[in-house]
């Protein structure tokens, strides 16, 4: 009996010994899931597009800082991003699993940025249990380092003026000045984030560094540039209506709508339609590109981080101009001066018209993704499938960005000038980020 007993005891000890020494495997799939989880929370909590860009960028930066420590491929963003001057050093002999620590940092920073913290915690706890069961020692060491980096990023994040802008005065609508923005149907919401240009930039010198060309002067003269641009929106809207809902212009407009403030009226009740933000859509494209290219964990984090930095900067630059020029939306001027029954294909979002946010951030994102994955990277975009829309194929990131930009014209919510100048603005931002940030060695 004794030999059998000792053999059994040895087998048990060997099992637990091997289990303890097994390194925890963290994959790109885990990181995609973490970003997807944040996107889903934003659908639940309904954050504005500018605020959503902030929720995406800081967790990604936290994760990137972890994987950049002692890396032979990536450089820390320390002293590259405004105000980010120190990151806790990583002891290469401490046994830290950097992928695990990166995810810990991402989740910890995410939790502070959303309302539904319990959703982050549920996702986090499921990973923590799996990791702890695999190798508790490695998990605890790695978690501790991830939390240290997260705390440093949260401290830096807290100085970006976001909290201060929550207390600033609401936007005042100037109805006595012709051509100024006014709230639009159906909800007639207040203008969102009128002080977003006060948020600290990450790479840009200031919110106005890439100030676009001045907006068109308001004029109802039928020979004026402004009047003809209004008429162009009116005419394309009527033309699309005649073609019907199955036409390509409708498909393009709906695919890139990305308006978290879209509402549906039923009787006396108003319901919000669940839609991702424009930044959320481009985060989805990062996922698609990373998966198609079989990017490893580190490159996946790098792609999300660099793209989310571009989106964040794009919103600050774009919003700086929106509330400088305060341009009236097509829907308002068409209803007042041309056709009181005309409606745009898409609901008009609640902020001034110039420049087109989709044009700015999509162009910037495409430039950054070209830099990471190469030009002419074809892909199938299935980001909108959960929202009842089909896939769309694109020959390149630039192809997708141009379609995103023109979608706002088809949707009846932007003039051509806003789209064209927004593309130029986004190009300037994207080129600047690519040239200034040295994230790879």
Residue ranges and their predicted role:
Residues 1-25:
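Bacterial Sec-dependent N-terminal signal peptides
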Residues 19-441:
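Acidic/polar surface patches and capping/hinge elements
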């Amino acid at each position: 009996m004794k030999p059998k007993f000792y053999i059994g005891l040895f087998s048990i000890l060997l099992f637990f010994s091997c289990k303890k020494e097994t390194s925890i495997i963290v994959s790109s799939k885990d990181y995609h899931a973490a970003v997807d989880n944040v996107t889903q929370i934003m659908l639940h909590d309904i954050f504005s597009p500018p605020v959503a860009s902030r929720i995406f960028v800081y967790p990604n930066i936290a994760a990137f800082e972890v994987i950049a420590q002692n890396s032979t491929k990536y450089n820390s963003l320390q002293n590259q991003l405004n105000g980010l001057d120190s990151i806790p050093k990583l002891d290469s002999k401490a046994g830290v699993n950097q992928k695990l620590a990166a995810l810990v940092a991402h989740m910890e920073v995410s939790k502070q940025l959303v309302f539904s913290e319990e959703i982050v915690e549920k996702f986090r706890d499921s990973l923590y249990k799996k990791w702890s069961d695999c190798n508790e020692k490695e998990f605890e060491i790695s978690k501790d380092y991830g939390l240290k980096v997260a705390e440093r990023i949260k401290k830096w994040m807290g100085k970006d003026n976001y909290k201060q802008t929550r207390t600033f005065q609401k936007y005042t609508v100037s109805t006595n000045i012709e051509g100024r923005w006014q709230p639009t149907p159906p909800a007639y919401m207040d203008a969102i984030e009128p002080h977003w240009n006060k948020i600290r930039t990450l790479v840009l010198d200031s919110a106005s560094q890439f100030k676009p060309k001045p907006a068109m002067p308001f004029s109802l003269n039928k020979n004026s540039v402004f009047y003809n641009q209004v008429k162009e929106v009116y005419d394309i809207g009527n033309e699309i209506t005649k073609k019907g809902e199955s036409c390509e212009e409708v498909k393009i407009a709906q695919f890139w709508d990305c308006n978290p403030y879209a509402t549906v009226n039923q009787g006396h009740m108003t319901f919000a339609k669940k839609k991702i933000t424009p930044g959320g859509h481009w985060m989805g494209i990062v996922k698609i590109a990373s998966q198609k290219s079989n990017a490893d964990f580190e490159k996946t984090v790098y792609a999300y981080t660099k793209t989310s930095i571009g989106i964040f900067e794009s919103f600050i630059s774009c919003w700086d101009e929106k509330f400088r020029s305060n341009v009236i939306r097509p829907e308002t001027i068409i209803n007042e001066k041309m056709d009181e029954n005309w409606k745009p294909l898409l609901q008009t979002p609640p902020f001034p018209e110039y420049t087109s946010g989709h044009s700015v951030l999509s162009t910037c994102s495409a430039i950054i993704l070209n830099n990471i994955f190469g030009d002419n990277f074809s892909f199938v975009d299935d980001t909108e499938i959960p929202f009842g829309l089909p896939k769309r194929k694109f020959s390149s990131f630039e192809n997708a960005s141009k379609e995103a930009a023109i979608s706002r014209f088809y949707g009846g919510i932007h003039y051509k000038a806003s789209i064209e100048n927004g593309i130029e603005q986004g190009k300037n931002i994207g080129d600047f980020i690519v040239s200034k940030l040295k994230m790879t060695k």
